[in-house]
Structures are given as structure tokens and as C-alpha cells.
């Protein structure tokens, strides 16, 4: 029994969530191999080979994989899957796009978004927006699994010395064609991996008022998030959305401002290490998960908070 993990990267560096997925995959079985598909990915393969618990790195390098099309990735994974009992990857946009295609072609039932490995065939996963948990046992000979990366600690980046093997890929698909990629460039930490996140909700009342959050985020070197209500109201773009239909975050510090705390939002942030809530409604559900709560008008509290941060005259790194 061996595990094949699909690495996520940008052709230059390994994406952080791959390290978390390695931790989870190694709990399934210690015979862990990692598949790296991309263009000019020698450095990516080398980096992964140095991760403890990784026994082998399989590299498929071709320009047709430069833009990470799931339609091009899938035939490669199917081709390499023959000798593996488990095919795994992260349960983010990358994995959610890729793994259902793999599972369908392998005619196996996918086990999605696991948060705990109970045994090689049994896993724990959240249901009902995280308000309940299901223990799932898979009887399939070959198991396709996506892992919620925030539920596992990242694997160390050094200490290993895995073998790197280069193999051929498959022909490019003609069903889809890459057109272009639009990326939002920001000096802020990435929302999904930031140590500190400050999010605003419908209580911000307008996009202009999000400048209050921006000023504090600058001081804390924090990522900016938002509830779905704030996004739907047009206060901020949807790439900032935290929750069941947005990003799942587990920062060291999560500050919720003007967010009532609908279960869909809580599903995306309630595993944060420390949660601070600021809301003038003392009955808001957000206070039920908060470690620290401030019942106050955010338009009075945030300027005072910023004033205190300015007195410190420091920016967190």
C-alpha cells in the first residue's frame, strides 16, 4: 500500500498547503510518493524531496502543464496511479477541480475534505457547515481523498532525501484551452496562509468604510477578509470572502468586525487559534466562538484601536 500525493506549486515554489497535505498523507501510510506536474519544475521537485516522510518524487515536466489545467493533469495521474492505494491532494480550489475527474475515471467514490485520518480506510470530515462530523469508511481498493490542509500541521521543509524520478506525461487535451490568467498582486499576506486576518461584515455599511480595516491591517501586516454579506453588498471583492463558499482560514489571530456570525462564515474561520469579535449586537452568534469579544460600535472602536497601534509605532512581521 502506497500513497500518491499531487503537489500544488507555481512552477517555481511549492504552495504552502502541500506541506500540510504531506503531513496528512504520511498518517495514511509511510510509503509516500509525491507527483510533481508542471513546466521547469526541477526546483519544486528538489524542495519536496527534502521533506521528511517523502520517499519518492515523480516529476512530469512539459510545457503543456505550465498552466495547471485539470484536463491535462488528470491523464498523468491516472497513468501513475496503478501502483497506489490512495491518491490525495489538498481540498482547495486546485484539488476540488482536479480530484473529482480522477475519481470518476478510476470509478471510485471520492472522500472529500477530511480533517482526521482514523485509519488507512477511515476518515473524519465535517458536514453541515462544520456543525457535525461524519466518520467515513471507504471500501474502494483505490481511494481518492482531498485533505483540508488547515486541519494538519505543515511538514518540515528539510531533513529528507527522497529519490527524484522523471517520467513522460500525456498528450495535451483538445477539449479545453488556456486563455489567460489574471492575478491580484498585493503586498499583503495571502488570505489562506496569513498569521493574522481582519475581516469585515455587513456592519461596515460601505466599501469606503473598509478603509478602517485596511489601516489596521497595514499595522498588523494582516490579510483582509470579509463575510459573504459584505461581498454580496459590493463592499469588497469576492477573493476576500471567508466561509463555507469562500476561503477557510486558520490564522493565529482572527479579528471579526461587524460580522454577525452566520454558520456559513463560522465554517471558514472557527478553527482560528484566537478569535476577537467586535460587534454592537451583544447577541450576535460570532461571540459564541470568540475568545475575546467587544460589544461596541465599530466606528468608535476601530479608530481607538488604530490610535493605540500608532502609539506602539511598530508593524508586525
Model-derived features: positions:
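N-terminal glycine-rich FAD/FM-binding segment characteristic of electron-transfer flavoproteins
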Residues: 1-317
Amino acid at each position: 500500500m502506497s500513497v500518491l500525493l499531487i503537489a500544488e506549486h507555481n512552477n517555481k515554489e511549492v504552495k504552502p498547503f502541500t506541506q500540510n497535505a504531506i503531513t496528512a498523507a504520511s498518517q495514511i501510510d509511510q510509503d509516500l510518493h509525491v507527483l510533481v506536474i508542471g513546466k521547469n519544475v526541477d526546483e519544486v521537485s528538489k524542495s519536496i524531496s527534502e521533506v521528511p516522510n517523502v520517499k519518492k518524487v515523480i516529476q512530469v515536466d512539459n510545457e503543456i502543464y505550465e498552466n495547471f489545467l485539470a484536463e491535462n493533469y488528470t491523464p498523468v495521474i491516472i497513468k501513475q496511479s496503478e501502483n497506489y492505494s490512495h491518491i490525495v491532494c489538498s481540498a482547495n480550489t486546485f484539488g476540488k477541480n482536479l480530484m473529482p475527474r480522477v475519481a470518476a475515471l478510476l470509478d471510485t467514490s471520492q472522500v472529500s475534505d477530511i480533517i482526521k485520518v482514523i485509519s488507512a480506510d477511515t476518515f473524519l470530515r465535517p458536514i453541515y457547515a462544520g456543525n457535525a462530523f461524519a466518520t467515513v469508511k471507504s471500501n474502494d481498493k483505490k481511494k481518492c481523498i482531498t485533505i483540508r490542509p488547515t486541519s494538519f500541521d505543515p511538514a518540515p521543509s528539510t531533513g529528507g532525501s527522497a529519490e527524484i524520478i522523471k517520467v513522460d506525461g500525456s498528450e495535451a487535451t483538445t477539449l479545453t484551452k488556456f486563455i489567460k490568467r489574471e492575478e491580484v498582486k498585493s503586498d499583503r499576506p495571502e488570505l489562506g496562509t496569513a498569521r493574522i486576518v481582519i475581516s469585515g461584515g455587513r456592519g461596515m455599511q460601505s466599501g469606503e468604510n473598509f478603509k478602517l480595516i485596511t489601516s489596521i491591517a497595514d499595522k498588523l501586516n494582516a490579510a483582509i477578509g470579509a463575510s459573504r454579506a459584505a461581498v454580496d453588498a459590493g463592499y469588497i471583492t469576492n477573493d476576500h470572502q471567508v466561509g463555507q463558499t469562500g476561503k477557510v482560514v486558520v490564522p493565529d489571530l482572527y479579528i471579526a468586525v461587524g460580522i454577525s456570525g452566520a454558520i456559513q462564515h463560522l465554517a471558514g474561520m472557527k478553527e482560528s487559534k484566537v478569535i476577537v469579535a467586535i460587534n454592537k449586537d451583544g447577541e450576535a452568534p460570532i461571540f459564541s466562538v470568540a475568545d475575546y469579544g467587544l460589544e461596541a460600535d465599530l466606528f468608535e472602536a476601530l479608530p481607538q484601536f488604530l490610535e493605540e497601534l500608532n502609539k506602539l509605532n511598530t508593524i508586525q512581521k
